[in-house]
Amino acid sequence: MTSTKDETVLGNARIVLTDRVIERGWIAFADGRIAEFGEGSGPAGSEDAAGDLIMPGLIELHTDHLEAHYVPRPKVFWDPIAAVVSYDGQLATSGITTVLDSLRVWREDGAEEVDGRAGLLANAITSARDANLLRSDHFLHLRCEIPMPSVVEEAKELVGRPDVRLMSLMDHTPGQRQFRDEGKLRAYYRGKGAGMTDAELDTLFERRFAYQKAYAATNMREIVALAHLHEIPLASHDDTTDENVTDAIRDRVSVAEFPTTIEAARGLHQAGIGILMGAPNVVRGGSHSGNIAAVDLAREGLLDILSSDYIPSSLLMAALQLPQHVAAIDLASAVRTVTKTPAEAVGLADRGEIAIGKRADLIRVHVARDIPVVRSVWREGYRVA
């Protein structure tokens, strides 16, 4: 990370605030904080932003893309610190200045491909951070697969870390939630890596049914209690039914990730639970697993936060596309779904908006042919990309 001057002033820019856009404005930041901004071309000597957007750095609550860098091919394991650095570079150049790295707390006998190696990757993130190798600000999101026998033990090993900002309650047992249609889940596994045979899938599904019956209820209570003990926000995952909504309310969930039906989304929203949907869902025009489209939820006023999920560049693309799909959403409110609202959801009050005194986590974005290009990225005032 390098900085060539104590103060940076950008002029001739479109400044995206929380409630409006300054169509021709300027912004100054120093000592890692936003100092001033206003209308007009800017003070003499301002760096010309050539009419580009200046936005808060994006805030990502749910991405498992680190796994693609650590295991770039089936059974090929990269150096974990090198994988973190590569992944971090992709995040930064996608405009993401704060990320909750989503680590799967999930160990399963006979299913090496779903072992997220959460502890190993968490330690690699720490090592990269301590060596000043990271451009984005990294926190952890522990994705707890509730039916797994060792999930409570593994979560306890990680939950005391100061960088844990979110825990989610997952249950990928076949025939429910995201994959109510078992056939779609079978197709998903057949398409992964070398694929799985029907016999292998039968064995996998039988084991997961048994795990859910034996462990899910007890593990759910213990994981929820663990999160509340450590004052870590909780997220539900793939809520589908009224029962799922009732459970989320009971467990004092603050964010609902990827509800699969509009009925569930309505119930969650009425309970004051923030709705998080996938940015790829917006960009592609629908869910890859055939569930509710994020744009349909947005039209109903049921979309609060976007997440890049599995492709970092989708976060910015989706935010800029939302106003094209939903008349009630303007650019400022669309940008809130990837900045201020996710920041508030996990208690990061010092960032996520352009306001005096907030962190100078900023991005400069050029848009051509409806494709956004991140020209520059600053984290706490330092140019990192």
Show the residue positions of the predicted features:
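Glycine-enriched alpha-helix->loop->beta-strand junction motifs that scaffold or abut catalytic
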Residues: 161-165, 248-255, 270-276, 301-304
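Active-site glycine- and acidic-residue-rich loops that bind
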Residues: 142-153, 239-243, 247, 255-257, ...
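His/Asp/Glu-enriched, well-ordered alpha-helical/loop segment
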Residues: 271-281, 285-366
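Metal-associated gating/positioning segment near the N- to mid-region
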Residues: 49-121
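Hydrophobic faces of well-ordered beta-strands that scaffold small-molecule active sites
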Residues: 59-61, 99-101, 138-142, 165-171, ...
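Metal-coordinating catalytic core of metallo-dependent amide/deamination hydrolases
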Residues: 106-239, 309
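N-terminal metal-binding scaffold of metallo-dependent hydrolase/deaminase domains
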Residues: 1-43
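Glycine-centered positions in the ABC transporter ATPase nucleotide-binding domain
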Residues: 13, 32, 51, 95, ...
